[in-house]
């Protein structure tokens, strides 16, 4: 959907192709990407190269399926790649239905440009890709969210504190019984 929408945009300042990177070797996954309009399938890159590719990109795209069966499977999950994108990436564009944890999380925190309806895709892509100030604001929000919720130094302390509170509460309840 995204590649097709991009390929139909007629703004010379907007890229009309998406570079897709994946290490998958599954023919059923790769072949449709290679044939899709607006998609340049680049294959696999090293983990070290990911940050460099992200740094040289206008945006990073996170997608979730609109198919009901897939929506049920991912309803409560948030990809670890999202945290990476928030911390190191350019503007994150999220495309998927509301009611999916990752889409809702990004939207509630203004940490991505969220397009949650297929009928809004082309217009939304044009808006975010032509508005540098909006992309920069989203990146600022994303960095702040990453520091708050996805920080390797802070999160273990948060978990320990939470576990200690649970233990303390349990001990207090047991001592009063």
Regions found by a protein language model. Give the residues of each.
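Conserved acidic donor-binding segment of nucleotide-sugar-dependent glycosyltransferases
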Residues: 79, 97, 110-119, 127-133
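Conserved donor-nucleotide binding/catalytic region of nucleotide-linked donor-dependent transferases
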Residues: 103, 126-144, 169-173
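Nucleotide-activated donor-binding/catalytic signature segment of Leloir-type glycosyltransferases, i.e.
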Residues: 10-22, 27-59
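Short loop/turn segments at beta->alpha junctions
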Residues: 25, 45-46, 78, 117, ...
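Nucleotide-sugar-dependent
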Residues: 48-52, 60-86, 92-104
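A conserved mid-protein helix/loop that constitutes part of the nucleotide-sugar donor-binding site
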Residues: 1-8
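A charged, aromatic-enriched C-terminal amphipathic alpha-helix characteristic of glycosyltransferases
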Residues: 116-119, 132-164
């Amino acid at each position: 959907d995204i590649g097709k929408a991009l390929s139909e945009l007629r703004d010379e300042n907007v890229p009309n192709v998406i570079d897709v990177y994946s290490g998958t070797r599954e023919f059923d996954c790769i072949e449709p990407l290679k044939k899709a309009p607006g998609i340049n399938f680049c294959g696999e890159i090293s983990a070290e190269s990911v940050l460099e590719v992200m740094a040289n990109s206008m945006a990073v795209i996170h997608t979730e399926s609109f198919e009901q069966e897939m929506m049920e499977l991912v309803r409560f999950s948030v990809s670890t790649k999202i945290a990476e994108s928030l911390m190191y990436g350019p503007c994150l564009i999220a495309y998927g239905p509301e009611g999916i944890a990752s889409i809702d999380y990004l939207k509630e925190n203004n940490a991505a440009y969220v397009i949650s309806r297929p009928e809004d895709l082309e217009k939304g892509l044009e808006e975010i890709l032509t508005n540098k100030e909006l992309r920069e604001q989203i990146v600022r929000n994303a960095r702040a969210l990453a520091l708050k919720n996805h920080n390797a130094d802070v999160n273990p302390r948060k978990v320990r504190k939470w576990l200690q509170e649970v233990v303390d509460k349990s001990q207090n309840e047991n001592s009063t019984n």
